[in-house]
Protein backbone atom coordinates (compact mmCIF):
# COMPACT_ATOMS: atom_id res chain seq x y z
CA UNK A 1 0.00 0.00 0.00
CA UNK A 2 1.13 3.51 -0.64
CA UNK A 3 1.40 5.95 2.24
CA UNK A 4 -1.53 8.29 2.67
CA UNK A 5 -1.44 11.48 0.66
CA UNK A 6 -3.22 14.14 2.72
CA UNK A 7 -4.28 16.25 -0.24
CA UNK A 8 -5.96 13.30 -1.93
CA UNK A 9 -7.37 11.45 1.05
CA UNK A 10 -6.43 7.87 1.83
CA UNK A 11 -5.21 6.36 -1.44
CA UNK A 12 -4.07 2.78 -1.20
CA UNK A 13 -1.90 0.60 -3.39
CA UNK A 14 -2.70 -3.08 -3.08
CA UNK A 15 0.76 -3.96 -1.80
CA UNK A 16 2.93 -3.00 1.11
CA UNK A 17 4.20 -3.85 4.56
CA UNK A 18 2.52 -6.08 7.12
CA UNK A 19 1.34 -3.10 9.17
CA UNK A 20 -1.13 -2.24 6.43
CA UNK A 21 -2.28 -5.76 5.56
CA UNK A 22 -5.46 -5.62 7.66
CA UNK A 23 -6.55 -2.27 6.23
CA UNK A 24 -5.72 -3.43 2.71
CA UNK A 25 -7.73 -6.62 3.23
CA UNK A 26 -10.75 -4.67 4.48
CA UNK A 27 -10.65 -2.25 1.54
CA UNK A 28 -10.28 -5.05 -1.02
CA UNK A 29 -13.08 -7.08 0.55
CA UNK A 30 -15.44 -4.11 0.87
CA UNK A 31 -14.79 -3.11 -2.74
CA UNK A 32 -15.67 -6.63 -3.87
CA UNK A 33 -18.78 -6.61 -1.68
CA UNK A 34 -20.13 -3.38 -3.16
CA UNK A 35 -19.22 -4.45 -6.70
CA UNK A 36 -21.19 -7.70 -6.85
CA UNK A 37 -23.77 -7.33 -4.07
CA UNK A 38 -26.53 -6.99 -6.69
CA UNK A 39 -25.61 -10.25 -8.40
CA UNK A 40 -26.94 -12.74 -5.88
CA UNK A 41 -28.99 -10.62 -3.46
CA UNK A 42 -32.01 -10.84 -5.76
CA UNK A 43 -31.98 -14.63 -5.43
CA UNK A 44 -33.27 -14.27 -1.87
CA UNK A 45 -36.52 -12.82 -3.23
CA UNK A 46 -36.88 -15.16 -6.23
CA UNK A 47 -40.16 -16.75 -5.04
CA UNK A 48 -41.65 -13.28 -4.40
CA UNK A 49 -40.54 -12.06 -7.83
CA UNK A 50 -41.96 -15.16 -9.51
CA UNK A 51 -45.32 -14.44 -7.88
CA UNK A 52 -45.16 -10.73 -8.75
CA UNK A 53 -44.49 -11.42 -12.43
CA UNK A 54 -46.62 -14.59 -12.44
CA UNK A 55 -43.98 -16.78 -14.11
CA UNK A 56 -42.39 -20.19 -13.49
CA UNK A 57 -39.29 -20.70 -11.31
CA UNK A 58 -37.18 -21.40 -14.41
CA UNK A 59 -38.35 -18.20 -16.15
CA UNK A 60 -37.73 -16.03 -13.09
CA UNK A 61 -34.44 -17.75 -12.34
CA UNK A 62 -33.23 -17.07 -15.88
CA UNK A 63 -34.32 -13.42 -15.69
CA UNK A 64 -32.57 -12.83 -12.37
CA UNK A 65 -29.41 -14.62 -13.45
CA UNK A 66 -29.35 -13.00 -16.90
CA UNK A 67 -26.96 -10.54 -15.27
CA UNK A 68 -24.34 -13.22 -15.89
CA UNK A 69 -24.89 -12.73 -19.63
CA UNK A 70 -23.93 -9.09 -19.30
CA UNK A 71 -21.01 -10.06 -17.11
CA UNK A 72 -19.68 -12.53 -19.67
CA UNK A 73 -19.93 -9.95 -22.47
CA UNK A 74 -18.30 -7.24 -20.36
CA UNK A 75 -15.53 -9.59 -19.30
CA UNK A 76 -14.60 -10.18 -22.94
CA UNK A 77 -14.91 -6.49 -23.82
CA UNK A 78 -12.66 -5.43 -20.97
CA UNK A 79 -10.14 -8.11 -21.91
CA UNK A 80 -10.01 -6.66 -25.44
CA UNK A 81 -9.45 -3.08 -24.36
CA UNK A 82 -7.76 -3.72 -21.01
CA UNK A 83 -4.45 -2.19 -22.08
CA UNK A 84 -6.15 1.13 -22.82
CA UNK A 85 -8.33 1.39 -19.70
CA UNK A 86 -7.24 3.26 -16.60
CA UNK A 87 -8.07 0.81 -13.83
CA UNK A 88 -9.26 3.24 -11.17
CA UNK A 89 -11.32 5.40 -13.53
CA UNK A 90 -12.90 2.34 -15.16
CA UNK A 91 -13.93 0.88 -11.81
CA UNK A 92 -15.28 4.23 -10.64
CA UNK A 93 -17.41 4.80 -13.77
CA UNK A 94 -18.71 1.22 -13.80
CA UNK A 95 -19.95 1.37 -10.21
CA UNK A 96 -21.53 4.79 -10.70
CA UNK A 97 -23.46 3.72 -13.80
CA UNK A 98 -24.48 0.45 -12.10
CA UNK A 99 -26.84 2.36 -9.82
CA UNK A 100 -29.05 3.34 -12.81
CA UNK A 101 -30.33 -0.10 -13.93
CA UNK A 102 -30.49 -1.16 -10.29
CA UNK A 103 -32.91 1.67 -9.48
CA UNK A 104 -34.94 1.07 -12.66
CA UNK A 105 -35.59 -2.54 -11.62
CA UNK A 106 -37.98 -1.10 -9.04
CA UNK A 107 -40.33 -0.01 -11.82
CA UNK A 108 -39.74 -2.74 -14.43
CA UNK A 109 -43.21 -3.34 -15.93
CA UNK A 110 -42.61 -6.85 -17.28
CA UNK A 111 -40.18 -9.74 -17.28
CA UNK A 112 -38.52 -8.68 -20.54
CA UNK A 113 -37.65 -5.25 -19.14
CA UNK A 114 -36.51 -6.85 -15.88
CA UNK A 115 -34.22 -9.19 -17.82
CA UNK A 116 -32.73 -6.35 -19.90
CA UNK A 117 -31.98 -4.34 -16.76
CA UNK A 118 -30.31 -7.33 -15.12
CA UNK A 119 -28.10 -7.70 -18.21
CA UNK A 120 -27.20 -4.01 -17.93
CA UNK A 121 -26.30 -4.56 -14.28
CA UNK A 122 -24.07 -7.43 -15.33
CA UNK A 123 -22.22 -5.27 -17.85
CA UNK A 124 -21.35 -2.76 -15.13
CA UNK A 125 -20.54 -5.29 -12.42
CA UNK A 126 -18.20 -7.33 -14.61
CA UNK A 127 -16.38 -4.25 -15.88
CA UNK A 128 -15.59 -3.21 -12.31
CA UNK A 129 -14.86 -6.79 -11.26
CA UNK A 130 -12.46 -7.51 -14.15
CA UNK A 131 -10.60 -4.22 -13.80
CA UNK A 132 -10.21 -4.74 -10.06
CA UNK A 133 -8.74 -8.22 -10.57
CA UNK A 134 -6.33 -6.79 -13.15
CA UNK A 135 -5.42 -3.97 -10.75
CA UNK A 136 -4.66 -6.44 -7.97
CA UNK A 137 -2.56 -8.61 -10.27
CA UNK A 138 -0.53 -5.62 -11.42
CA UNK A 139 -0.14 -3.84 -8.08
CA UNK A 140 0.40 -6.75 -5.69
CA UNK A 141 3.79 -8.21 -4.92
CA UNK A 142 4.13 -11.96 -5.37
CA UNK A 143 3.98 -12.43 -1.60
CA UNK A 144 0.78 -10.38 -1.25
CA UNK A 145 -1.10 -11.60 -4.30
CA UNK A 146 -2.64 -14.75 -2.81
CA UNK A 147 -4.00 -12.87 0.19
CA UNK A 148 -5.29 -10.02 -1.96
CA UNK A 149 -7.25 -12.30 -4.27
CA UNK A 150 -8.57 -14.29 -1.32
CA UNK A 151 -9.71 -11.03 0.30
CA UNK A 152 -11.50 -10.02 -2.89
CA UNK A 153 -13.31 -13.35 -3.21
CA UNK A 154 -14.14 -13.17 0.51
CA UNK A 155 -15.87 -9.85 -0.15
CA UNK A 156 -17.77 -11.65 -2.89
CA UNK A 157 -18.79 -14.31 -0.35
CA UNK A 158 -19.89 -11.64 2.12
CA UNK A 159 -22.05 -10.04 -0.57
CA UNK A 160 -23.82 -13.38 -0.98
CA UNK A 161 -24.66 -13.57 2.71
CA UNK A 162 -25.31 -9.95 3.64
CA UNK A 163 -26.84 -9.06 0.28
CA UNK A 164 -29.40 -11.84 0.54
CA UNK A 165 -30.19 -11.04 4.17
CA UNK A 166 -30.68 -7.36 3.43
CA UNK A 167 -32.66 -8.03 0.28
CA UNK A 168 -35.03 -10.39 2.08
CA UNK A 169 -35.47 -7.98 4.99
CA UNK A 170 -36.04 -4.85 2.89
CA UNK A 171 -38.41 -6.61 0.50
CA UNK A 172 -40.34 -8.19 3.36
CA UNK A 173 -40.80 -4.92 5.28
CA UNK A 174 -40.77 -2.22 2.59
CA UNK A 175 -41.62 -4.05 -0.63
CA UNK A 176 -39.77 -5.16 -3.76
CA UNK A 177 -39.33 -1.63 -5.17
CA UNK A 178 -37.62 -0.32 -2.03
CA UNK A 179 -35.25 -3.25 -2.20
CA UNK A 180 -33.86 -2.13 -5.56
CA UNK A 181 -33.59 1.52 -4.53
CA UNK A 182 -31.58 0.46 -1.49
CA UNK A 183 -29.12 -1.52 -3.59
CA UNK A 184 -28.74 1.39 -6.01
CA UNK A 185 -27.53 3.43 -3.04
CA UNK A 186 -25.01 0.70 -2.23
CA UNK A 187 -23.68 0.89 -5.79
CA UNK A 188 -23.00 4.60 -5.33
CA UNK A 189 -21.32 3.86 -2.00
CA UNK A 190 -18.97 1.53 -3.86
CA UNK A 191 -18.04 4.30 -6.28
CA UNK A 192 -17.30 6.63 -3.36
CA UNK A 193 -15.11 3.97 -1.71
CA UNK A 194 -13.08 3.49 -4.88
CA UNK A 195 -12.68 7.25 -5.33
CA UNK A 196 -11.16 7.69 -1.88
CA UNK A 197 -9.15 4.47 -1.45
CA UNK A 198 -7.83 3.16 -4.77
CA UNK A 199 -4.61 4.75 -5.98
CA UNK A 200 -4.37 6.02 -9.54
CA UNK A 201 -2.77 3.70 -12.09
CA UNK A 202 -1.95 4.13 -15.75
CA UNK A 203 -3.36 2.00 -18.56
CA UNK A 204 -1.06 -0.95 -19.20
CA UNK A 205 -0.20 0.23 -22.71
CA UNK A 206 1.51 3.23 -21.12
CA UNK A 207 3.63 1.09 -18.83
CA UNK A 208 5.82 -0.47 -21.48
CA UNK A 209 6.51 -0.34 -25.22
CA UNK A 210 6.05 -4.06 -25.90
CA UNK A 211 2.33 -4.36 -25.25
CA UNK A 212 0.61 -6.95 -27.45
CA UNK A 213 -2.53 -6.36 -29.43
CA UNK A 214 -5.71 -7.53 -27.65
CA UNK A 215 -6.25 -10.44 -30.04
CA UNK A 216 -2.61 -11.50 -29.75
CA UNK A 217 -3.06 -11.55 -25.98
CA UNK A 218 -6.19 -13.69 -26.34
CA UNK A 219 -4.37 -16.14 -28.58
CA UNK A 220 -1.46 -16.37 -26.16
CA UNK A 221 -3.78 -17.06 -23.24
CA UNK A 222 -5.80 -19.66 -25.13
CA UNK A 223 -2.64 -21.43 -26.26
CA UNK A 224 -1.67 -21.90 -22.63
CA UNK A 225 -3.14 -25.32 -21.65
CA UNK A 226 -3.22 -24.41 -17.98
CA UNK A 227 -5.15 -21.22 -18.62
CA UNK A 228 -7.59 -23.09 -20.86
CA UNK A 229 -8.20 -25.54 -18.04
CA UNK A 230 -8.63 -22.70 -15.54
CA UNK A 231 -11.18 -21.00 -17.82
CA UNK A 232 -13.15 -24.26 -18.01
CA UNK A 233 -12.97 -24.69 -14.24
CA UNK A 234 -14.39 -21.19 -13.78
CA UNK A 235 -17.30 -22.11 -16.08
CA UNK A 236 -18.05 -25.23 -14.04
CA UNK A 237 -17.78 -23.49 -10.67
CA UNK A 238 -20.49 -20.91 -11.33
CA UNK A 239 -22.59 -23.48 -13.22
CA UNK A 240 -22.67 -25.50 -9.99
CA UNK A 241 -23.02 -22.55 -7.63
CA UNK A 242 -25.91 -20.86 -9.42
CA UNK A 243 -27.61 -24.18 -10.04
CA UNK A 244 -27.55 -24.85 -6.33
CA UNK A 245 -28.40 -21.48 -4.85
CA UNK A 246 -31.00 -20.44 -7.42
CA UNK A 247 -33.29 -23.44 -7.34
CA UNK A 248 -32.79 -24.48 -3.72
CA UNK A 249 -34.82 -21.36 -2.89
CA UNK A 250 -37.91 -23.00 -4.38
CA UNK A 251 -37.19 -26.26 -2.55
CA UNK A 252 -36.98 -24.38 0.75
CA UNK A 253 -40.36 -22.64 0.39
CA UNK A 254 -42.21 -25.77 -0.72
CA UNK A 255 -43.36 -28.69 1.46
CA UNK A 256 -41.96 -30.37 3.47
CA UNK A 257 -39.63 -27.49 4.44
CA UNK A 258 -42.09 -24.62 3.78
CA UNK A 259 -40.14 -21.67 5.19
CA UNK A 260 -41.29 -18.04 4.82
CA UNK A 261 -39.66 -15.14 2.90
CA UNK A 262 -37.86 -13.66 5.92
CA UNK A 263 -36.70 -17.09 7.05
CA UNK A 264 -35.39 -17.65 3.52
CA UNK A 265 -33.13 -14.65 3.97
CA UNK A 266 -31.76 -16.01 7.25
CA UNK A 267 -31.03 -19.33 5.55
CA UNK A 268 -28.13 -17.61 3.83
CA UNK A 269 -26.16 -17.51 7.04
CA UNK A 270 -24.88 -20.72 5.45
CA UNK A 271 -22.36 -18.43 3.71
CA UNK A 272 -20.88 -17.30 7.03
CA UNK A 273 -18.29 -20.11 7.21
CA UNK A 274 -17.22 -19.30 3.65
CA UNK A 275 -16.28 -15.76 4.68
CA UNK A 276 -13.72 -17.23 7.07
CA UNK A 277 -12.47 -20.16 5.00
CA UNK A 278 -12.06 -18.32 1.69
CA UNK A 279 -9.45 -16.03 3.26
CA UNK A 280 -7.30 -19.14 3.72
CA UNK A 281 -7.24 -20.05 0.03
CA UNK A 282 -3.97 -18.23 -0.66
CA UNK A 283 -2.24 -20.01 2.22
CA UNK A 284 -3.62 -23.38 1.14
CA UNK A 285 -2.29 -22.96 -2.39
CA UNK A 286 1.08 -21.82 -1.06
CA UNK A 287 1.31 -24.88 1.20
CA UNK A 288 -0.25 -27.65 -0.91
CA UNK A 289 -0.38 -26.31 -4.44
CA UNK A 290 -3.17 -25.34 -6.82
CA UNK A 291 -4.26 -28.80 -7.91
CA UNK A 292 -4.69 -30.43 -4.47
CA UNK A 293 -6.44 -27.31 -3.18
CA UNK A 294 -8.91 -27.33 -6.07
CA UNK A 295 -9.60 -31.05 -5.76
CA UNK A 296 -10.23 -30.74 -2.03
CA UNK A 297 -12.57 -27.78 -2.57
CA UNK A 298 -14.57 -29.53 -5.28
CA UNK A 299 -14.78 -32.72 -3.20
CA UNK A 300 -16.16 -30.77 -0.25
CA UNK A 301 -18.84 -29.21 -2.45
CA UNK A 302 -19.66 -32.64 -3.87
CA UNK A 303 -20.14 -34.09 -0.39
CA UNK A 304 -22.72 -31.41 0.34
CA UNK A 305 -24.91 -32.08 -2.70
CA UNK A 306 -26.66 -35.31 -1.53
CA UNK A 307 -27.67 -33.54 1.68
CA UNK A 308 -29.76 -31.12 -0.39
CA UNK A 309 -32.10 -33.99 -1.27
CA UNK A 310 -33.04 -34.91 2.29
CA UNK A 311 -36.43 -33.78 3.74
CA UNK A 312 -34.69 -32.14 6.69
CA UNK A 313 -33.95 -28.42 6.98
CA UNK A 314 -30.81 -29.12 9.04
CA UNK A 315 -29.46 -31.48 6.38
CA UNK A 316 -30.21 -29.05 3.55
CA UNK A 317 -28.55 -26.19 5.42
CA UNK A 318 -25.44 -28.29 6.08
CA UNK A 319 -25.34 -29.22 2.41
CA UNK A 320 -25.56 -25.55 1.45
CA UNK A 321 -22.69 -24.75 3.82
CA UNK A 322 -20.47 -27.39 2.23
CA UNK A 323 -21.33 -26.38 -1.33
CA UNK A 324 -20.71 -22.72 -0.49
CA UNK A 325 -17.36 -23.32 1.23
CA UNK A 326 -16.18 -25.64 -1.52
CA UNK A 327 -17.16 -23.53 -4.52
CA UNK A 328 -15.90 -20.24 -3.07
CA UNK A 329 -12.58 -21.82 -2.08
CA UNK A 330 -12.28 -23.25 -5.58
CA UNK A 331 -13.12 -19.86 -7.10
CA UNK A 332 -10.46 -18.07 -5.05
CA UNK A 333 -7.91 -20.72 -6.01
CA UNK A 334 -8.70 -20.57 -9.73
CA UNK A 335 -8.79 -16.76 -9.79
CA UNK A 336 -5.37 -16.49 -8.18
CA UNK A 337 -3.98 -19.15 -10.51
CA UNK A 338 -5.09 -17.24 -13.62
CA UNK A 339 -3.40 -14.09 -12.38
CA UNK A 340 -0.07 -15.86 -11.96
CA UNK A 341 -0.25 -18.13 -15.01
CA UNK A 342 -0.84 -15.04 -17.16
CA UNK A 343 2.41 -13.19 -16.60
CA UNK A 344 1.50 -10.63 -19.28
CA UNK A 345 -1.80 -8.93 -20.17
CA UNK A 346 -3.40 -9.95 -16.89
CA UNK A 347 -6.44 -7.78 -17.58
CA UNK A 348 -7.07 -9.78 -20.74
CA UNK A 349 -6.65 -13.11 -18.93
CA UNK A 350 -8.93 -12.01 -16.09
CA UNK A 351 -11.53 -10.90 -18.62
CA UNK A 352 -11.53 -14.24 -20.42
CA UNK A 353 -11.70 -16.12 -17.13
CA UNK A 354 -14.63 -14.05 -15.90
CA UNK A 355 -16.40 -14.36 -19.25
CA UNK A 356 -16.16 -18.15 -18.95
CA UNK A 357 -17.10 -18.02 -15.28
CA UNK A 358 -20.25 -15.97 -15.81
CA UNK A 359 -21.15 -17.86 -18.98
CA UNK A 360 -21.18 -20.95 -16.79
CA UNK A 361 -23.68 -19.24 -14.51
CA UNK A 362 -25.97 -18.36 -17.40
CA UNK A 363 -25.79 -21.83 -18.96
CA UNK A 364 -26.32 -23.41 -15.56
CA UNK A 365 -29.40 -21.30 -14.95
CA UNK A 366 -30.89 -22.18 -18.34
CA UNK A 367 -30.15 -25.91 -18.35
CA UNK A 368 -30.72 -26.66 -14.69
CA UNK A 369 -33.86 -24.52 -14.63
CA UNK A 370 -35.45 -26.67 -17.31
CA UNK A 371 -34.33 -29.81 -15.51
CA UNK A 372 -35.81 -28.47 -12.27
CA UNK A 373 -39.16 -27.61 -13.90
CA UNK A 374 -39.56 -30.78 -15.96
CA UNK A 375 -37.73 -33.53 -14.05
CA UNK A 376 -37.24 -32.27 -10.52
CA UNK A 377 -34.72 -31.27 -7.90
CA UNK A 378 -32.85 -34.63 -7.68
CA UNK A 379 -32.02 -34.49 -11.40
CA UNK A 380 -30.95 -30.86 -10.99
CA UNK A 381 -28.55 -31.88 -8.21
CA UNK A 382 -27.21 -34.62 -10.49
CA UNK A 383 -26.39 -32.01 -13.13
CA UNK A 384 -24.58 -29.93 -10.52
CA UNK A 385 -22.53 -32.95 -9.45
CA UNK A 386 -21.56 -33.56 -13.07
CA UNK A 387 -20.22 -30.02 -13.43
CA UNK A 388 -18.05 -30.44 -10.32
CA UNK A 389 -16.71 -33.68 -11.78
CA UNK A 390 -15.76 -31.95 -15.02
CA UNK A 391 -13.96 -29.23 -13.04
CA UNK A 392 -12.00 -31.89 -11.14
CA UNK A 393 -10.91 -33.51 -14.41
CA UNK A 394 -9.81 -30.14 -15.82
CA UNK A 395 -7.76 -29.50 -12.68
CA UNK A 396 -5.43 -32.32 -13.76
CA UNK A 397 -3.95 -29.82 -16.24
CA UNK A 398 -2.94 -27.39 -13.52
CA UNK A 399 0.60 -27.68 -12.22
CA UNK A 400 1.59 -27.01 -8.63
CA UNK A 401 3.44 -23.90 -9.77
CA UNK A 402 1.89 -22.06 -12.74
CA UNK A 403 4.03 -21.98 -15.87
CA UNK A 404 4.81 -18.64 -17.47
CA UNK A 405 3.65 -17.62 -20.91
CA UNK A 406 6.13 -16.71 -23.61
Model-identified regions with their sequence ranges:
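Helix-to-loop junctions at the C-terminal end of transmembrane segments
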Residues: 75-86, 277-289, 372-373
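Helix-loop-helix hairpin linking two adjacent transmembrane segments in secondary transporters
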Residues: 113, 142-144, 151-198
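Helix-breaking motifs and short loop linkers at transmembrane-helix boundaries and internal kinks
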Residues: 54, 86, 107-112, 141, ...
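Juxtamembrane intracellular "pre-TM" segments in multi-pass secondary transporters
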Residues: 9-18, 199-231
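C-terminal transmembrane helical hairpin of 12-TM major facilitator-type secondary transporters
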Residues: 291-334
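Cytoplasmic helix-loop-helix junction between adjacent transmembrane helices
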Residues: 117-156
Amino acid sequence: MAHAVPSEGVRMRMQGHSSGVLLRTIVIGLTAFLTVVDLFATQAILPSLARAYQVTPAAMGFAVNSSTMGMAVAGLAVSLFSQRINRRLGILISLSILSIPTALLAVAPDLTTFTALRIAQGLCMASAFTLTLAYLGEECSAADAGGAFAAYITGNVASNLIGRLVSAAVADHLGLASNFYFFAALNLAGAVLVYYTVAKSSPMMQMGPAARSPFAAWIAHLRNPQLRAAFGIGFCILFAFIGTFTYVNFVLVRPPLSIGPMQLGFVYFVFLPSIVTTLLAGRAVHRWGTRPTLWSSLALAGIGLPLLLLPSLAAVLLGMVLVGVGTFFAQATATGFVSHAATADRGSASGIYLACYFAGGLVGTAILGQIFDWIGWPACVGGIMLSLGVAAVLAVRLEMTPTKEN
